[in-house]
């Protein structure tokens, strides 16, 4: 799916009055490595939305095609009471895949979540996601450049612990002994929180940056600003395992 700056491809709700969570989202499954116990990188995972679909493998440069100049708007619908889509979900996607110039508006869960994989993503804008702006787990090891996340003035999240970045080394922090914990790099990142500056769970970020459960992140040239509230700017502690940034 390749648009242009003048004519981006738009995935959105079929409604004149769309709201977040109106439809599912975009999910890409690849064959790149994820965290696991096998030294030969043969571990696979099952998608959150439908466990009939696998992802992961040992192909670092796996190619899932290209996604450029794309808008994803009002995604994040729930498939069950406990499972909801992200705007963009990248499961074990390899670095042979091209993902650039992506705009995600008002996803009902995370704007984008990486489940392992090695894919590199450039130029990503996330506006008013209900949960995390950028979420990483299960051994993600790619490079990210030019990331911009914003909560606009007057926006209200309904999640208990929304974050700018949330990073786990392994899936749900339950596998601290796994090989290939998340270890990724972010260059040029801006997080703007202009939501209400209060202390309750629906009007502030839990953490701007949360690196935990064995994850490691190298963040270069980052700017955090805004009038909104947060409990922690950077937090690397967790009851299951700490992180490293």
Regions found by a protein language model. Name each.
Residues 2-3, 8-109, 113-130, 135-245:
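Extracellular beta-rich repeat passengers
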């Amino acid at each position: 799916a390749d648009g242009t700056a003048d004519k981006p491809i738009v995935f959105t709700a079929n409604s004149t009055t769309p709201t977040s969570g109106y439809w599912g989202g975009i999910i890409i499954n690849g064959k790149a490595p994820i965290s696991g116990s096998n030294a030969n990188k043969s571990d696979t995972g099952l998608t959150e939305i439908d466990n009939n679909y696998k992802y992961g493998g040992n192909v670092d440069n796996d190619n899932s095609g290209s996604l450029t100049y794309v808008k994803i708007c009002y995604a994040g619908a729930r498939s069950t009471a406990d499972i909801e889509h992200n705007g963009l979900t990248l499961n074990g996607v390899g670095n042979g895949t091209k993902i650039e110039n992506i705009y995600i508006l008002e996803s009902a869960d995370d704007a984008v979540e990486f489940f392992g994989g090695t894919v590199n993503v450039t130029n990503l804008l996330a506006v008013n996601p209900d949960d995390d702006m950028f979420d990483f787990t299960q051994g993600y090891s790619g490079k990210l450049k030019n990331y911009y996340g914003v909560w606009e003035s007057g926006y209200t999240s309904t999640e208990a612990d929304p974050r700018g970045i949330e990073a786990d080394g392994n899936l749900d922090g339950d596998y601290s002994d796994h090989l290939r914990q998340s270890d990724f790099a972010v260059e040029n990142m801006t997080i703007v929180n202009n939501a209400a500056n209060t202390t309750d769970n629906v009007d502030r970020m839990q953490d701007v940056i949360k690196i935990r459960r064995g994850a490691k992140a190298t963040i270069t040239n980052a700017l955090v600003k805004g009038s909104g509230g947060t409990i922690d700017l950077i937090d690397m502690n967790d009851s299951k395992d700490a992180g490293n940034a």
